[in-house]
Amino acid sequence: MENRWQVMIVWQVDRMRINTWKSLVKYHMYVSKKANRWFYRHHYDSHHPKISSEVHIPLGEARLVVTTYWGLHTGEKEWHLGQGVSIEWRKRRYSTQVDPGLADQLIHMYYFDCFAESAIRKAILGHIVSPSCEYQAGHNKVGSLQYLALAALIAPKKIKPPLPSVRKLTEDRWNKPQKTKGRRGSHTMNGH
């Protein structure tokens, strides 16, 4: 019998970003209690040698599983030192992979406060509006004009430490264009 392969999308992530993610998840599970229904599985509880950790996030009947890997083949860049993340949505026997933006939206929908529909009406009438959105990572596009007006009216609370964002975990911060200071950049680099 021939081998059967299953291909998964694994986002290459540097080790420090994975450590930050794990730390934020544990903080909000055990200290702030905002993620107290989440389940953290350590590497020694897994039967797969490449799995570093798993975070199971219940979403109603379904759940989101964020798996971190180690010991993978390195990527094109030297900082891709064999670390990666996969994000999976599971319900009973069905599972599918999701991208970080959708994962953040699902987490936002189930776990964190945001403006209610009545908040817009209350703000127009001059009433105090609360709560504002605690999990900004769950909004991946520009909101309605009413939502933007509310967001400008009520400054979001700064939560220390920030809530764990899957998109932030998987973003490619290395390949973003560098901004230079001033109009012409550094004088020594320009030869002036």
Swiss-Prot record:
It comes from the Viruses. Processed in virion by the viral protease. Residues 171-172 are annotated as: Membrane association. Residues 176-186 have a biased composition (Basic residues). One of its GO terms (biological process) is viral life cycle. InterPro entries: Vif. Residues 40-44 are annotated as: Interaction with host APOBEC3G. The record marks L150, A151 as: Cleavage in virion (by viral protease). Keywords: AIDS, Host cell membrane, Host cytoplasm, Host membrane, Host-virus interaction, Membrane, Metal-binding, Phosphoprotein, RNA-binding, Ubl conjugation, Ubl conjugation pathway, Virion, Zinc. Residues 151-180 are annotated as: SOCS box-like. Residues 165-192 are annotated as: Disordered. Residues 14-17, 74-79 are annotated as: Interaction with host APOBEC3F. GO terms for cellular component: host cell cytoplasm; host cell plasma membrane; membrane; virion component. A motif (BC-box-like motif) lies at residues 144-153. It is a peripheral membrane protein. The BC-like-box motif mediates the interaction with elongin BC complex. The HCCH motif (H-x(5)-C-x(18)-C-x(5)-H) mediates the interaction with CUL5. Vif-defective viruses show catastrophic failure in reverse transcription due to APOBEC-induced mutations that initiate a DNA base repair pathway and compromise the structural integrity of the ssDNA. In the absence of Vif, the virion is morphologically abnormal. Homomultimer; in vitro and presumably in vivo. Interacts with viral RNA and Pr55Gag precursor; these interactions mediate Vif incorporation into the virion. Interacts with the viral reverse transcriptase. Forms cullin-5-RING E3 ubiquitin-protein ligase complex (ECS complex) by interacting with host CUL5, RBX2, elongin BC complex (ELOB and ELOC) and CBFB/CBF-beta. Within the ECS complex, Vif interacts directly with host CUL5, ELOC and APOBEC (APOBEC3F and APOBEC3G) substrates. HAMAP family: HIV_VIF (MF_04081). This is Virion infectivity factor. It comes from Human immunodeficiency virus type 1 group M subtype D (isolate NDK) (HIV-1). The gene is vif.
